[in-house]
A protein has these predicted regions:
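DNA-binding interface regions
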Residues: 1-148
């Protein structure tokens, strides 16, 4: 049997109710997350249905396996508001994430940096080298010659 820690966010307008998000973390994660290695990965991706975005954060076990810290489906595009909801949920259930020894690797997209600075100010945000290179190629147009 698997137990989930779950929050459902409803956006309520007069006369109707609209599901705007679902955030999950498995119950055993409360005991496991404090013992994971101190490097976590976080990312978001657009979903194939509706205008929802999938948010996720994973840690690494001692055996180098990925372990799900938290996951969420939130209505709308990836933005600071969505990351704020996600990180507040993750921090509520895993307060050990807000520690100066924690490094969170992200892709520096759409509000994640500002959200981490506001909600997990002690954690260190490090940018993924793959995405860093993609940004250099796209925005600076560098990296196309031998010594650029």
């Amino acid at each position: 049997m698997l137990f989930l820690t779950c929050h459902i966010y409803l956006c309520v307008a007069p006369g109707n109710r609209f599901l705007s998000g679902l955030l999950l973390s498995i119950a055993p994660a409360k005991a496991v997350v404090p013992h994971l290695q101190t490097v976590f990965q976080a990312d978001a991706a657009h979903m194939n249905f509706g205008k929802y975005t999938l948010y996720s954060c994973y840690g690494i076990t001692a055996n180098c396996n990925a372990f799900l810290v938290a996951i969420g489906i939130i209505f709308g595009n990836e933005d600071k508001h969505g990351w704020d909801l996600f990180w507040k949920f993750a921090l509520k259930h895993h307060p050990c994430l807000n520690d100066h020894r924690i490094t969170i690797i992200t892709d520096q997209q759409k509000g994640i940096t500002e959200s981490l600075q506001g909600i997990l100010p002690k954690a260190v945000n490090f940018f993924c080298s793959f995405h860093w290179r993609q940004n250099i190629l796209q925005y600076i147009k560098g990296g196309k010659s031998d010594y650029s």
